[in-house]
């Protein structure tokens, strides 16, 4: 007998609906749900193999207490009660001794409702040091565009869209659910332009591909703005009536040297002019940006400049152009940004989070600030913390510094599915349940909400949101966790509880027509009520009111190349390296280089290469030739570690991990706390006596 359970994949925020088939031997298999209006039954490889996470023999199933030194991977099993009691005792002692802010809380990539629960615990503990990945994922894009347009625009891609610019994004790999609309527009004649150092799916199929120097995006955006203004190609009516600061922007670009900007990108003026004309002449056009534009210190201003391009072209809130978000969410607390949670601590107090960036809306502590406080005690000491569903040993900048910082902590707790390099640095490790192991609520990409069914219990693992609440209760600062109350709060916008949602299975979001030209009646949600080409608010924060291009880190004779990174379609950041079905598809970290560079450095395909950004910053990855790359650009894999190495070198966290190469230096213009990831000056050469592990 084959039992089918319809539920939702929780590996990313897309929320693909899946059918889990269970036979009489309790063996599971996964297929996409063809009734899902977003995916139509399609599913990525990670989702197809998600059951392997739940059933993996190396899952953490009991609370663990460290017995050896940090990183030695020596533990004893303890009860949940002992774990919670010891955590509460240590956390309370830390705050009583060193102050409320000596305790930090860190979460990772979007995990529905869990990150908000951690924010609530931080609020209850009166600590401003809540940390997430936003400085290099989402915040630069969101706030850069909001400071300009008053909102973060979507893309109304349909048969009316005449031009699509893919900028630092590969939807084919990372958000395949959007490809249906993209392909529909292309079939109806849309011109496509791809801005990316490597030949992605979009670049391969584009009408124009701009393989710019990694990290030179702001130079390209400012070159396009200058061309549009110099040639008077902008939408004169929209700019005159609905934009603030055009004369200041015009004066600014008058001073720019187009040849210099083009050279910084290693693109011809002719190519930049051609694609700018294609974009500006389209009746309706969209720019789709990706995570790559969140990655460098200038990322906020990159997104400001792109929003300015959207405005100059007049593609705001028109059919087939950039769209305004609309409608209210059917759930509460899915993301840790809701005012009722954020405002529990005043903005004035939140500004004291360590490393807090100048942009006040980005109130969280930064990884750079946390590490500096752990190591120096400045501006105050960070002594203990709770890390939930993230792996800072691979995801924070300067992995060696992360280890040094964690070694200074008095007490560290990690909630995880597996023993990661970060978990090995903890004092207590708590076993987290995968999304298959608890009943709950999920939200799809279209805004619809769904009941998430539980398949089975694995050991004594618990859902992260419950773990967080139980820690808060043990500390005496949160009520006893009640599952019904938790989900009823999440479902408060639709006024039902979890059992009622289970009976309904799903509540579909209303299909609303895209708003067009709403600014005619309500303006834009900015101080001037217009699109802010010049931002007085940024000026008052002593930040650039108009985007200013500053060169990336300079190349040198020793480091003449530039390295950037890209995500694998087979993994979620550092997650999944122990899943054999995924590892078989991508067994080793890959660095892509031009064959001419390989010949120059005596490297062949399959060789292990050393990638170096400083004498003490070297990683090793397997060479693959890609002659579509510029000869001085290399693309290295992201977030690698080797679970099969166990405690040896923290599961190989320093062998191939890209963040060994990065630093906590954010330069002089990191408005939002982003650090250098794209375009690091480097060298590459053949490694000796290095073998990379594979399972």
PLM feature spans:
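Long, contiguous, secondary-structure-rich segments that constitute the structural scaffold
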Residues: 458-460, 464-505, 581-592, 599-695
